[in-house]
Amino acid sequence: MGAATYNNYNVSLTHYHRISERFAFSTGGFYEHTGGFFENAARNNEKVDRSNAGGGRFRGVYIPTSNLKVDINLNYEYSDQGGYPYYYTGITPSAIAKAKENGKEMTEDRADYIGKISYNDRSSYRRGLLNSGVNIEYQANNFILSAVTGYQHLNDRMFLDQDFTERDIFNIEQKQRANTISEEIVLKAKPGKRWQWATGAFGFYQWLHTTGPVLFKEEGVKSVIENNANSAFEEVSAKPGAPTMGMTVYLSLIHI
């Protein structure tokens, strides 16, 4: 158990137990909380990077005979983290110089937000991770045969305010589910033999599903999609003989 400044604390517990000469196990769990350092001005100075994490593990060893051992491992961890404490740095000198080259004047219209973290949607990363494995070892008179089977499951979600401003423009929610199965078989000579040799095989299979839709909100639909499209149409319409064109979007939310 521990505690620190900025509202950080953690606790963990582990137990070891030997039931018999043939079976023993250990198990444990933990929880961690981080209060965070950075504040978001657009969300009442809410901590951007606070986080919570917890998990548990189990290991069991079974020896049914003198030459056979089974080792089982299971571990799970869940975390929910805030993050991405990006802040506005202002218009760069290079951008101002480039605008002047193109005959345009660029002025700072967001001076009040320089150096401040200020975005309206809470950005975060959430993850659940499961790892498990079984190791079976058989000792014959002249060799040792071991087989290790592993499985991993990952389920995570990243939510990001992509405009990183106090305006309600657009965000992304990326979800991922990944599964991996692996197998390793090793055949080797026993220690102390004149000839030491080893051979084996390894293989794995993984399948992954990812989604990452971008959500344009009402202000984003207007400023990013509709206004940009109409600016392009104005340039086309300014050419001699070109038709007058325009676009109006009636949807307040658009998933892409």
Where do the language-model regions lie?
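Sequence/structural signature of outer-membrane beta-barrel proteins
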Residues: 4-8, 34-41, 79-81, 154-156, ...
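Conserved small/polar residues in nucleotide/adenosyl-binding loops
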Residues: 254-256
